[in-house]
Amino acid sequence: QLGSPTALADPETERRLREAAARGGHTLYVPRGALWGCEDIRRMDEGGTLAALKVTMTKAPQSFHLEGWLQERLAAAVAAGGRAVLYEGPLRPLCPLAPNNVNTMAAAAVAAPSLGFDGVRACLVADPSVPDWHIVEVEVTSVGDEGRALSVTSTRRNPAAPGAVTGNATRHAFWSSL
């Protein structure tokens, strides 16, 4: 079992973990944590109907524990005092910059291997107006004919202690997904 799916953003780590599990006759289990709709995403991916997946995570600035240039972007957002998009793009490059904050996004990449860490879109938002909430929005789009496709958006509002990296309900969601 893997506690932090963000670790799988490193292809070598993922390869070594999967090989070790296979040698022992096991499967590498990745809990979904705060990812709502994980089973539906997986079914769409397996059925070849998943076209796009975007996960947006919005938290108070003090709930982020960031690395590298994202620390500077967060500091600028705090100084400006308003809502700020810290990152928007493919998930893989975000993982080492926010390893404590993007496990839900990483679970989405694992649930949708056809998209993976390079195809899942990630958006990280710092918003001081939500000091005690972590908000996860998952946008799923299917393949479609003539520009018409199924689209599903879910929003999960998780109460959180001010400054907490993990919301109150996430711990229970993690353990219940085992």
Question: What do these predicted ranges mean?
Answer:
Residues Q1-L2, G89:
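Conserved acidic functional residues
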Residues H26-L178:
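Active-site-lining helix/loop region of Rossmann-like oxidoreductase modules
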Residues G3-T27:
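Rossmann-fold NAD(P)-binding glycine/threonine-rich loop
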